[in-house]
Design a protein with these regions (language model features):
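Acidic, proline/glycine-enriched N-terminal capping motif
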Residues: 1-141
């Protein structure tokens, strides 16, 4: 990756488990969730910190009930955990997509990510995190 040049490689990782809301009263569980995200990110990312505007996509795949988690409460702990591991500062996150996907429903998986396919085969809750270059404005839905 060439930091600051727009030429970094797309980053992705899988975080096993159910996300903990940023609004959780159980601060220890929230801290543990952020640590899980950091560990997964460190295992998948060996490049220098990204120092340019980025696109962050967080997809929560779950079985059964999603726990009533709001998208913004899923996003915040993940974004906080990636800061200082993948990207320098969260102000670099210019575009965000958060998706909740119930594994009990039939759906087409719009990905060629081997990591996602392998995680789906386990039929357990997980979060797929992607950090990528900003798309051209006209290319974004």
């Amino acid at each position: 990756m060439e930091s600051g040049t727009g030429h970094f490689s797309r980053f992705e990782c899988i975080v096993a488990g159910t996300p903990i809301s940023s609004q959780s009263a159980n601060r220890e569980r929230l801290r543990d969730w952020k640590q899980s995200v950091r560990q997964s990110a460190r295992a998948a990312w060996s490049g220098p910190l990204v120092r340019e505007p980025i696109y962050l996509k967080v997809t929560y795949f779950y079985v059964g009930f999603d726990g009533g988690l709001d998208n913004d409460n899923i996003l915040k702990p993940v974004q906080d955990a990636l800061e200082g591991v993948v990207f320098e500062d969260d102000h670099l996150v210019h575009i965000v997509t958060v998706i909740r996907c119930n594994l009990d429903r039939e759906f087409a998986v719009p990905t060629t990510s081997r990591n996602v396919v392998q995680a789906l085969e386990r039929r357990r809750d997980f979060v797929h995190v992607v950090v990528d270059r900003l798309p051209a404005f006209e290319d974004f839905p």
